[in-house]
A protein has these predicted regions:
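Elongated, amphipathic alpha-helical interaction scaffolds
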Residues: 1-328
Length: 328
């Protein structure tokens, strides 16, 4: 059941999906946040992740989603989590959410037999908002309609309506976030990122961190460092941890990130120099033969590219430059 299988592009998506695509993390959080009667009816032990994303492609930098199925009585229902990490309120969010729900139903119909008695599964929509401020919107689709005064009763049969569960991290104190250790630490960290509070004690709760899987701990540290925090404060915070194993892991991840950053910098520098060499040749001699252009663009040795840039500026002909390339 899927609209697309696009890769994760955003750090918020990566951390959110790494944690909450695991049914045990999603179930432990959702059963505490959806209405009590619904939570009691859902068989959370059989919560199953469905593949795909239903979000508009141009909005995937601001939102991500997960779809689950689970039994309620003798029927399956769907639980849809829309994670909004945009920093502004969207008054028409319910309309966009409805669009995603329609896509889910259409996909469901494609994947299931459509006999005369076919009926759509109920979707329990949940919106998780990361914004640092509380939103003023009402989580009720019917509230979007401009119904003429005095006509509410007459028009009620024609006004579609559904509600969604709105969970706002801005309104949840750190200690009120419930779930598994991994789920709690992911949401605490995401909440703190919006308020520039990533060194707060709840984000470094050792009693929970020691229970978090290693791959999630690594993503948490990468997420924190990716927020461009003060590196000296990070080092001080890590050194204050009592668990030596956590200290070691955090600093190892930080070292890996620095090494990756240097490698990316070298790669980007090589690509820029290669483009500069080709541009210099084009300015001086016009069209650059494709084989020569391809050869230059695959080079990543910065020293060699710098030499070739000087050669490109000084050489008398493309043929002379080609000989220079051959000579290294």
């Amino acid at each position: 059941m899927a609209m697309s299988e696009d890769p994760i592009h955003h750090p918020h998506d990566k951390l959110f999906k790494a944690g909450f695509s695991r049914s045990e993390n999603a179930a432990a959080f959702l059963r505490e946040e959806v209405p009590a009667a619904v939570a009691e009816a859902v068989d959370w032990s059989r919560l199953h992740l469905e593949p795909g994303s239903f979000i508009d492609s141009h909005l995937r930098g601001f939102a991500s989603d997960l779809l689950f199925s689970a039994p309620i009585g003798d029927a399956d229902c769907l639980v849809y989590i829309l994670f909004e990490h945009q920093t502004r309120e969207e008054p028409m969010l319910a309309l966009r959410l409805l669009r995603y729900m329609v896509r889910i139903w259409e996909t469901w119909l494609q994947n299931h037999s459509q006999g005369r008695g076919a009926r759509l599964p109920v979707i329990v929509p949940v919106v998780l908002a990361q914004d640092s401020k509380l939103w003023s919107l009402t989580p009720d689709f019917a509230c979007l309609f401009d119904v003429p005064a005095g006509q509410e009763g007459n028009l009620a049969p024609f006004v579609p309506g559904f509600s969604f569960q709105l969970i706002e991290l801005a309104g949840l104190p750190f200690e009120a976030i419930r779930g598994t250790p991994a789920g709690i630490m992911i949401l605490r960290t995401m909440k703190a990122e919006r308020t520039a509070d990533l060194f707060a004690d709840p984000v470094w709760d050792e009693a929970l961190l020691v229970q978090v899987p290693e791959e999630i701990f690594e993503l948490l540290v990468r997420y924190i460092l990716g927020a461009d925090v003060d590196k000296e404060r990070f080092r001080t915070r890590v050194n204050s941890l009592l668990e030596v194993d956590l200290q070691t892991k955090a600093m190892t991840i930080a070292d890996q990130l620095r090494a990756e950053g240097r490698q990316e910098g070298r790669q980007e520098g090589g690509e820029a120099l290669a483009r500069a060499v080709v541009s210099a040749l084009e300015v001086r001699f016009g069209k650059v033969p494709e084989d020569l252009r391809a050869s230059i663009k695959t080079m990543r040795d910065l020293d060699r590219l710098e030499r070739l840039l000087r050669v490109a500026i000084e050489v008398e002909s493309i043929e002379d430059f080609r000989r220079g390339v051959g000579g290294g």
